[in-house]
Amino acid sequence: MPNQSQHHLQPHPHHLRPQQQQQQQQQQQQQQHHRQQQQQNHSDFPLPDGWDIAKDFDGKTYYIDHINKKTTWLDPRDCYTKPQTFEDCVGDELPMGWEESYDPNIGLYYINHLAQSTQLEDPRQEWKSVQEQMLSDYLSAAQDQLENKREMFDVKQQRLLWAQEEYNHLKLAASRSSLCSSSSSMSRHDPELLRADLMLARERVHQLKQELNHITNDISYTERGMNTLYSVGEKINARQNGCYDIAEVQAIREEMLKVHKSLVSGEKVREELMRSLVQIKNELSRQQISEENSDLASPFDRVCVASQTDLCGSTGDNLNGGARFAEMAKTKLQYAEWRKHIKKLQQQLADHVERIEPGQLESDKDRILLIQEKEKLLNDLNSISLKSRSEEEKRVIQQTRNKLEEDLKEAYEANNTCVANRLRFHEEKQLLLDKLQEALKSTKLLEERLKSFSSESTFSISSGSSLGSLSTASSKSALSFTDIYIDPFAVDSPIDVVDLRRRSQRLFQQHQRLHPVHPGLQQQQQQQQQSSEVSLSPRSSLSMETPPASPMKYNPGADPTTPALKEEPTYANALPAPPAYTAPPPVPVSGVRARPYDLDSTVLDCMMLEAKLQKLNLGTPLNLAAAPLSPISEKPSLLDLPQEMLSRSSSTSNTRSVSAAVSNESVAGDSGVFEASRAHLPRKELAQVQIGLKYLKLEGVLVVSLERANNLLALWTASADNSQVYLRAALLPNSLTSIRTKALGDFQKPVFNDTFAVPITLDKLLTKSLQVTVVTMTGQKEEIIGTVQISMAEFNPEDSTLKWYNVLSSKFIPTFESLDLPSTSAAAAAVAVAASSSASNSIREESSDESTITSSQTSTLTRNQAPPMELQAQIAEEQPEQDGSDDDDDDDEEEDDNNKKIIREVAVGLMNSGCMLDTYLQNMKQEFADKETNTDCAFLPEKSRGQSQMMDDRPVKRSQTFTPSAAVSKNRYNCRLNRSDSDSAMHCGVAPHTFQRGAAERRSLRFHTKAPKSVTKLHHTHIPRTSLDLELDLQAQHSKLYFLNDQIAKLQNLKEVLQKACENKDPLIAAWAIENEEFQRLVARADPAKCPEERQLQKLLMKTAKEIHKLRKTKVPKGCPDLVSFKEKITFFTRKGMSVPELPSEFTLPEANPIEEEEEEEEEDEDEFYNAAETAIAINTALVASNNRNKNLTDHLNRVSNYAAPKPPTIPAPPAASPAAPAGSNPPSATPSTTPATQATTTAVPVPADDNNPEQQRYDYVVDRTYGVEV
């Protein structure tokens, strides 16, 4: 055995994945190639005397020096065949004493036999020195960024001090005004206005303290990240050659995996805590709403007046087989186009990453925030009144103004040159991200549409594979870049830097033109301006369009300055984006390129309308029992839409939270400007039924309440006086019992008020449909005049609903022959069974051409119906090639779970539809049924042959001629006979494999992986991970774990406080939980009420970010280091993570915080001040009244002194006299003066106070000589 050892780690084949095994084989072949070449070079030179060759137990060659009795791995002939130093190396050569080795878990590493050490870095590359220089440059830039944050902290602190002083001045003015409020001649200010100003100033101080606390947290976060980076640099420099050996690399890797497991478990705890916070927040909201208005219904019980009766008919049910298959093919084409668009957007985003350096946007944001803080401070100084200031204060304020103006000018000149281009790139990136999000929404809608076809056929598509191997599952043997540094919770919600810069520029341009406006007057002017905007004109008061009943706006050329309105998801063909408040329907089908229709939100319209009506004193509280309107009146007008959109416009899966009390049309009629649209004219004749639904989970009972009906005369005219009407309901299908209301003779507005309980389990309920029929009874004769069909699949068992439903007249219900299976469902069953039979026979080999042609007719039909394989082949081919790096080796576990789920769904569908296939085949007509090759087809008429020939002269495939509906022209009927159905269905350029007779079914050949390329000599073009990379990854994991534990602790504390508040029904904490924006953003991340489509969209966005990272890595030239990824690594440590809001000081007992303690003292001072002020006002009023009655001043003073014998409580000194006051400003006096004339006589003399005893800081108050009382 050689005594010169190397740290060789044994591989574990059972932990390796196929790509790693292939990479290991390539590395082994490369090493064998080097050994063979080395042996060929050494064969020219014999071994020196006394040397011998031997092999170790693992087959590795070592050399024996018999003279010195030593063994070594080095060949003594290397001194003749290898270069001596790195400068002498050419190409991939290593100098003498160096060896390249490979470990399956770590990868390539290098052995220095001369120094008897191992290292991860390639000694031939200088990537490590480049990394160290980049780290040093970033630390200097981060130091500048930290200085900006500290300067921002100083400016914010100055704003806080000036705001506190202004608050104290207003408090003093309010105290003076309160003492002389009884006489209007003595008061210089309105007491109510001063009191409002005082509240505004106090809120401003409180807000500035919160902002100061946030900046403090940002500074501490940045300092911690910089300290971590400094420690990493020092740790690497302390190592020998700045490199870790293989044993240390293995230990670091194992530690990272352990930390990752802790992160996974901690994230589960955090998600559970956030879900608990969502529930507590909802409970607090319910308590507050119930306390404020117990008569109104809870907003969580949504009221919907959307039409549940599809008057236009469901497209999926009315389309025949051919139209449905054409619709599915069109959807597939749209899906393919959107996928190409997504790939294009991803590529553009990958290009934009190189333009914007990581961390530069954060630095620009800090610069702009600093400028904005200085502008706000300048505006605060400009708004300060200088009348009551001393000369020293005026001089300090003017100097501060001049300095701020100079700083702002310099900052704008510097930022306009360097920040403008970066912000333009950032704005372009944001636009691309918005487009990508809209494209993902559209792709998701199309996937749902394709899944709806899968319920009738065997086509299935997985959301996990929709974008091609975008797996979130991490590798079991290594952590990738995306696993460590791409974390949605590791980054706080971003700030729109572009908008921030625009606002800062507007402030800078306007601060000189703006005059100081009194806060109270400014608020009053705003209120007057808002009230003046509401005109008494009936048209302007509603702020509506003509016709007022239709919220649809046709906007072919929208103004770029106005925000674009989003489209209804039903018309996703023109513009794909569904509104954020709706659950996207599964139909963005038709590919008609119609003009875009911008639809206003119905909920938004009603809220704005209600608010304006309340201002006009026309609004009435919402009442569910009000006269019902047509639900379609809340929908857009259907008459202006293209015919292709009509099939989707009337039935959507969304139920809007809209009241039925007031409509746009009714209000417009009241205002005198009634312009009804064409779509509203026939709706007044609709018959409606009000039905309430509620499910009791504990009892397993569905409560059906048949309340009332409206305008049933539109369905049937009573022919006799004794005619009555009743409602009958049943859960279909397979309903054993039905429920029935009492019979009434009122056909206009009958009130039934009947409630029934139907025992049924929840899983069965969601598969049922509630059918309510309107039945008339004349004597012994009964007749069904209308029907309401309600799908329980859309019913939310968590909510109780009370809705109006349109009744479809029985005259419009067509009568069909009693078939065992509808044609569309039968066609779907045929597709399912055919696909299942083809899947079960996938192992069977094809015997001959004749047998294939025999079954080609039926298989052609099934292929035209729903062949999913082409799309799946396209998805498989569009997956990016793996480059062998560790972050491209993720297991797609989520995709496998989705596929297993879909397989189970398809299997259930096959079992249900298999028994119906025979019935369908008997009822279906077949034009051609011969078992030979059929070359007949349906030809076009003679008059259209020329036009058809001009349009398309492509040859017709043989398999297309078997479809009876495939009408072609005889002039271009060129039948191309392929061997089988699978070949004809396959595009000529899709399959890279040649024909193999006797192989398995060739349809699966399209999914074979590409043949492995011949293994050639591998060049060192891959930049491996260095020791600095490993240390940064480890510290990043530790940082994430530290902040995760901190978040969990804060969330746990917040949960406990909110739980106690919920149990005690504390209104203050409930108001904070509802109004705090930071808390609302926090719970919005884990709100279970968020629709599943939004959660899936967030997952897709996360996967797309990882895909963009992979695309960007492919743009890095081979052999060049990835500079952007390394910059992202080091900027990760200074990015602020998700912040957990902290409760105010009055709700909790946190550690000592000087800012919060000062706030508490101010509150106590204010309470004492108000008590003393009330006492003084009462005494002052009595004194003035007695002075008017008695002219004798001496008797008056004696009586008042006897009356005011109890001394009022003394007022402590306000905190403005603390060292927090700005330099050069005198502390404001706490002694209020009654009038300017008495200021000289009524003064406060401060008592010398001991600094160690804060209780001695009191003022002695003298007696006012005019009124004879203490003030």
UniProtKB/Swiss-Prot annotation:
Gene: Kibra
Source organism of this protein record: Drosophila ananassae
Biased composition (Pro residues): 1206-1217
Family the UniProt entry places it in: Belongs to the WWC family. KIBRA subfamily.
Assembly information from the UniProt record: Forms a complex with Mer and Ex. Interacts (via domain WW 1) with Ex (via RXPPXY motif). Interacts with Mer, Sav, Hpo and Wts.
Subcellular location as annotated: Cytoplasm; Apical cell membrane
Segments of this protein annotated with the region Disordered: 1-51, 518-566, 838-899, 1143-1169, 1201-1265
The protein, known as: Protein kibra
SUPFAM superfamilies noted in UniProt: C2 domain (Calcium/lipid-binding domain, CaLB) (SSF49562), WW domain (SSF51045)
Gene3D superfamilies (alphabetical): 2.20.70.10, C2 domain
Keyword Coiled coil set for record: yes
Biased composition (Low complexity): 18-43, 522-543, 850-862, 1218-1249
